[in-house]
Design a protein with these regions (language model features):
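C-terminal catalytic "cap/lid" subdomain
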Residues: 1-296
Length: 296
């Protein structure tokens, strides 16, 4: 589901719920790094910027690239989230700084995902508009009575702002980073060039958790637990059991597979690690391993 909603009032309401769950963990002295989805937000920004350019008869404005749209979504979602967390903590008598970092994530230009795009973005287009997009080298797919653009979802390779994230953690701050999977970039000499892609947030969360050497990775979603293909709830399982379930195609490739696969990657990358997948409201109970899907 979309974690933050499609309108600004809906987002305000949902970030308050997220802030309450996070504050529960802070009260128990957990050190926290937060990443988040940018669900429809990045697509809405891209649609708005594209429409603005299309309606500008004087051609003073151009379409914003996906990397820029991703940066915008990181900024405004992070702004709402950090202020909601700050307020919730102060209401509980806790002073703890919260900072948002606009985060660039390196992707491999040869990642096979660029040849098999999966993420649908933007508004519905006419056949003529879709043809124009394809002439630019973009991919489109049919949707309803029209067409929409589809972009790649490569895996994260490195996080450029990791030193800044760790410095803030060492200073006792709560850090919001790599929102929406981070801004996908490629190295070109000394330049970081934005890629026309959206990184799957679950994989970036696992990469970030690994790089800061976290003990736990929590993926908070709309489900209390993951389920097998025949609807059986998945509780505490080993990495090998999780891999077997992946190999047996128990998870949807777009929605649940990345969560389980990213959890396996994180737990397998270090000693004594645990991944938890559960509902946002269950964050505290989840980290105590009382509820949710626990992989360790």
């Amino acid at each position: 589901r979309n974690a933050f909603g499609e309108t600004f009032p809906e987002q305000k309401k949902n970030v308050k719920k997220a802030a309450q769950a996070i504050a529960d963990l802070v009260e128990q002295k957990y050190q926290i790094v937060i990443t988040h989805s940018n669900g429809p937000q990045v697509g809405m920004i891209q649609t708005a910027m594209t429409e603005f350019a299309r309606l500008d008869n004087d051609k003073n404005y151009t379409v914003a690239p996906m990397s820029l749209c991703g940066a915008m979504s990181e900024g405004y979602i992070g702004y709402d989230l950090q202020n909601a967390i700050r307020t919730e903590l102060l209401d509980r008598g806790i002073f703890k700084p919260v900072s948002t970092i606009i985060t660039q994530v390196r992707v491999d230009p040869f990642d096979k995902a660029f040849n098999h795009p999966t993420k649908v973005i933007g508004r519905v287009m006419t056949r003529e508009e879709a043809d124009a997009e394809e002439e630019k080298g973009n991919h489109v797919v049919p949707e309803g009575d029209g067409f929409r653009r589809i972009i790649a979802s490569p895996k994260p390779v490195d996080i450029y702002e990791i030193d800044a994230i760790e410095a803030l953690l060492d200073a006792g701050q709560i850090v919001i980073a790599a929102g929406g999977g981070g801004i996908p970039v490629m190295e070109q000499g000394t330049t970081l060039k934005g890629a026309s892609a959206v990184i799957e947030k679950d994989y970036t969360a696992a990469k970030l958790a690994d790089m800061v050497d976290a003990s736990h990775l929590m993926i908070l979603t709309s489900k209390e637990q993951m389920e097998t293909a025949d609807g059986q709830a998945i509780g505490k399982i080993s990495v090998s059991d999780a891999i077997s379930l992946i190999d047996e195609n128990h998870f949807d490739a777009i929605t649940t597979l990345p969560k389980v696969d990213a959890s396996v990657s994180f737990v397998s990358s270090g000693e004594g690690r645990t991944a938890i997948i559960t509902k946002l409201e269950n964050a505290y109970q989840g980290i105590k391993e009382r509820i949710g899907t626990i992989i360790k």
